[in-house]
């Protein structure tokens, strides 16, 4: 009976380790103040209390630069075969790179903007260093 208990303990330990690794391998990056980047399918979302999605920068997010109060997102919108529920209008089509600026404090989103528009936007706010080394 002692041998059976040892086998149970070993199996339970292995199961716990597997669950821990699966749970830790999630493709979510918490960006602070309720913002999350999801690697798959590649979008940024802000969640209100509970599980209510407040806004979403739809796929595909190519890179982002995150600070405590701001978030700069480089995005290439994808066309889906199904209807995409997004409030954003892409004035130059979906084959263009766009940028979004998120003020986490006020939870406001500026974008989609072209690179030149984003440079002007950030210079007006003395934040042009955010474009350097955009992840």
Q: Which positions does each model-derived feature cover?
A:
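Intrinsically disordered, low-complexity regions of eukaryotic proteins
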Residues: 4, 29-30, 105
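N-terminal export/targeting and maturation segments
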Residues: 9-70, 74-76, 88-89, 129-133
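Hydrophobic residues embedded in beta-strands of well-ordered beta-sheets
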Residues: 44, 69-71, 79, 99, ...
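Short, surface-exposed beta-strand/loop "edge" segments at domain boundaries and coil↔beta transitions
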Residues: 51-57, 79-84, 106-111
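Short beta-strand element of the conserved SAM-dependent methyltransferase core
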Residues: 75, 101-102
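Structural motif
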Residues: 79-100
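C-terminal partner/receptor-binding element of secreted or periplasmic proteins
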Residues: 103-135
